[in-house]
């Protein structure tokens, strides 16, 4: 799917246009963020989760017009993408599974098993 960056002259609102986006590549193209397909292929879920995390921290943007929101969304997506250009998923620890401590080891003696 070829996606065009958002235009304020469009018949669609920003939210309506974003409803059509289905992949990380769609988001990157829509927001005009240049990307390396190899980076996205390996890190797409991490990039999108980091983008979501950045959006959550940005607070409520609904009071702003589409053009201002587009600029903020674009900046945050570019930042999320660059996190994985400059680093990797294991280092960035976006998902909980990467932040978990080592599994706990418990010793059970033979005596305990036999009793």
Swiss-Prot record:
Protein name: Nitrogenase-stabilizing/protective protein NifW
Subunit structure: Homotrimer; associates with NifD.
Coiled coil, from the record: none
HAMAP family: NifW
Source organism: Azotobacter vinelandii
Superkingdom of origin: Bacteria
Family (UniProt): Belongs to the NifW family.
InterPro entries assigned: NifW
Listed GO biological process terms: nitrogen fixation
Function: May protect the nitrogenase Fe-Mo protein from oxidative damage.
Keywords: Nitrogen fixation
């Amino acid at each position: 799917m070829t996606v065009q960056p958002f235009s304020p002259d469009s018949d669609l609102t920003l939210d309506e246009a974003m409803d059509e986006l289905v992949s990380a590549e769609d988001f990157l193209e829509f927001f005009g963020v240049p990307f390396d397909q190899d980076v996205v292929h390996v890190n797409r879920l991490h990039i999108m989760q980091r983008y979501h995390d950045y959006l959550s921290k940005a607070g409520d943007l609904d009071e702003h017009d589409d053009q201002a929101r587009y600029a903020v969304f674009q900046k945050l997506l570019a930042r999320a993408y660059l996190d994985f250009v400059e680093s990797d998923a294991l280092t960035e620890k976006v998902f909980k599974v990467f932040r978990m401590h080592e599994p706990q080891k418990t010793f059970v003696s033979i005596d305990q098993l036999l009793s």
